C-alpha cells in the first residue's frame, strides 16, 4: 500500500513526522481519495458560448470557472451578488449544474515510487477551487456587465428614451442599448423594458451576457433586452421588441413576403421621411437626422458628420461611437475598434469604404446586403449598425443572430427579393420602431439555438416570425431543465463512484494511514530491512541519474519520502481545514431555508433522497445546503410534502458528534447511504466555498492547534480584506518585511517574486486569471512546457488545459519542502552514499520523484545572497562534490538550509516570536508556523523530541547527518558530514 511503502522508509524523519502529525496536524483519513475514485471523464471544457443556460442556483457554489478563457472585459461585479456568493464570483456561466463539478483527480505521479501512485490522489476540486478563488480564475458568464463595457455601456440603455428602459434591462450586455431602441416609444418601451428588459436582464444577463459581447448579446439579449450585446441589441429588446411588437407584425409579415428591397428600399419615403426615419435608423435617406435628430437608438452618423445619437456616435472625423463607427474621412473612429480604410477590418464589425468585407464573415459591404447585425442601405450608405439599413430594407429578426446560419441567402433575406409590395416593406420599417413595446419578448433572441433558423429557404413570415418567439419561450423554460439535468446525472455519477470506490478506498487509505500513525515502533523496527535492500542498489549505480530509470526513482524516494510525507500532511491539513468544519457549513441555512430545497437544488438527497430537497438543508439540517442531516433538525418540515421521508431520515441520521458521524460515514455502509455526503465518506468532497472564504479571511472562529503565541509573528502583515488570498502578506511574514497588502488584487505576484528574488515580470492578467505556469517557470527558471496532460511527469510550469496541472505545482513544492527540511547534503554522490538530496538539474523537474532540485539550485544563489552566504556556483554538477559552505547560504548541491535565511530575515535581534511563522490569516485551521518552525529548524513548538539526528538540540531540527545549534532566533547549521 502506498503509505506503507512510501513512508516506512529509511528515514528517522518518518517517526518524527508522525509524532508531529499526531500532535499538530489533524488526522485526515478521508482526505486522500484513492485511485478508484479517479474520475474517468475528461473535464468538461465550458463552451465559450455556453449552450447551457447559465441560470445557476443562487447558492454558494462557484459556477462557470472557466480556466483559460478570457472574456472581453468582465467587470468585477460590485458588491456581493444577490445570491450571496462572494464578490469575485459571478454565478452563472460555465457549468450547467450547481455546485462544484468534481474535477478529475490528478494523480500525483511524482511521489517517488511508481507503485505508490495508486493511492495518492489529491482532489483537484479542493485545490483548484482554492486556487481559482485565490487567482479569481472564475469567469462567471453570468451577467452582461462585461459586455456593457463593450457596448460602451449606456449606448442602448439611455439612448432610446423609453426604450432606454428596455435597454436598461438590456443593461445586460449593453445590448440593452439596442434593446432600448426596441423600447421604442417610451411607454411601449417601458413595457418591453419590463418584459424584454427584465427578461433581457435575466437572460441577457445570465444568458446573453454569457454569450459574449456582441454575439452574446445577440443570443442572450434576444431573450430579453439582453440582445443588446453590442449588436445583439437588435434582437434583444430593441429588435425583439420592435419586431415582436405590433409594428413587428406589420414589418415581419411584409418583409416575410419580402419584396424587391433593392428598388423599394432606396425609394421608400417612409423610412426616408425627414421626420420619421425608422425607429432604429433614425436617418432620412438623405443622411440627415431623422426623428428629431434622435438617430437610431444605437449609433448613427449623419452624412454631414454631426453626431447621430448624442453620446454614442459622432460623425466627426476621428471621433466615433462608443461602439464602432468610422470617421467620415475613413480614419479610425473608435481607437482600434473600427477603421474606415477600405478593406481594413474593424474589431467589431465594419465595412470598408469600398464595401469589401471588414470583419471576417460577419459583414459584407455590398450595398444593401449585410449581416443580420449591421445593415447598409441599398445605396451603400450606413444603415444602422443594427438591424436595418437606411433604405427601407430591414432585417427580419428571424434572419439570424450573428454567428448562426442565415436563412436563405443574406441578400434574398435582407433585400427581400421576393417581396411583391414595396409598401409592405415600408410598413415594416415603421413596424420596427413602433412594435418595440410588445416585441419586448423579442424572443428573437436565442436565435442561434432555435431550429427554424436552419430552414434556410424559408422566408420570414408572420407566423415564422412569431413562432420563433414562442419556440424561444419554451427554450427559456427549458433552461432550468437543462441545468437541472446535469445535476441529476452528476448525482448518479457520484453515487455510483462512491459506491464502487468506497470500500476499497476505505480499506487502503484509512487502514494504511492509521497503521503508519499508530504503529510507529513497528515501522522503525522495519526500517533497517529497507535500508539494507535499498542502499546496495544505490551503490551499484551511484552515477545513474537518468530521470526515467525506476532504480533512480527508488533511489530518490528516500528524500522524497520525507518531503512527500510532510507534503502529504500539509495537503491533509489544507483539505481538512477546508472540509473539516462541516458542521459550520451546515449552519448556513439560507441554502435550504426558503424552499427547504437542500441548499437550492443542490440538495443531497436529490430531492427526496437525503432528507429530500425539502428537508435537506432546511438550512437547519447539519449539512445546511448539503443537508447532511437531511433536515437534521427541522429539515423534514422544510419540505412540507417531504415530511415523512425526512423525519425517518432524521432519526436515522441524527447525530450529535461530528466525529462520530464522520466515522460512521466511513464504516457503516447503510448509514453512509442515507446520511453522508460524498466528502464525508472520503468522496470527491464538494465543500462550501463560502466557508473556505471565511477560512481564508480568518473569520472562522475555529483555529486548530495554533495558539496566539505560536503563530505570533514579529512582522506585521495586514490580513487581506477581500476573499482573495493575498500571498504577499504571507511572504512578508516569512521574510520579516511588512508589506501593505493590496486589498483588491487577487495575488500580487510582483511582490511574491520580488521576495524570492526572481524577476518580477510575471504579469497578472485580470481577465484570464493568473497564469501559474508563468509564475512557476519564473520561480523554477525553467521554460514552461505547454500542453502536457494532467498525468504527465511534472515539468516546471506545465499548465493543462482544463484545470491546473497540479503535478507541476506539486513538483514545485517538493523541492521547497525538501529545502525547508534541509535534507542531508550529499557532497559526494559518487561514493554511493545514499543520496537524500535531489540533484540540481536546473529548472526542470526530474522524473516522477518530487525532485525539482533545479528550483532549489536556482534559489540557492538568491538565498545565499540574501543571507550573506558565499555565492555558490550554480553550475556545480551533482557528481562533483560541492564543498559545504559553513555560511548559512548553501550551495546548490546540498539541500537548502533555510534556517539561516529565516533567521537572518527575522527582524530585530530578539523578536517576540522566535520562529518565522505564516500569519494566521492564511487558514485558521492550519498552523504552518509550527510546521515551518520545525522544518526550518526554528524552535520546536511542541515538546517531546522525536528521534533526532546527530547534533540536534531539543529545539533545533538539523538536517540529517548535520549538526546544528539553537540560537535565540532560530537554528544554525554547524556543519554536515
Swiss-Prot record:
Residues 428-443, 591-643 have a biased composition (Gly residues). Keywords: Glycoprotein, Secreted. It is found in: Secreted. Residues 37-50, 541-557, 660-675 have a biased composition (Basic and acidic residues). Residues 51-63, 309-325, 730-744, 758-767, 785-801 have a biased composition (Polar residues). Residues 447-457, 465-540 have a biased composition (Basic residues). It comes from Lottia gigantea (Giant owl limpet). Component of the acid-insoluble and acid-soluble organic matrix of calcified layers of the shell (at protein level). Residues 410-427 have a biased composition (Acidic residues). Residues 23-116, 246-767, 780-922 are annotated as: Disordered. The keyword Glycoprotein applies. The keyword Nucleotide-binding does not apply. GO terms for cellular component: extracellular region. Residues 251-278, 572-583, 700-724, 803-814, 822-857, 870-907 have a biased composition (Low complexity). This is Aspartate, glycine, lysine and serine-rich protein. Glycans are attached at residue 136. Its main location: secreted.
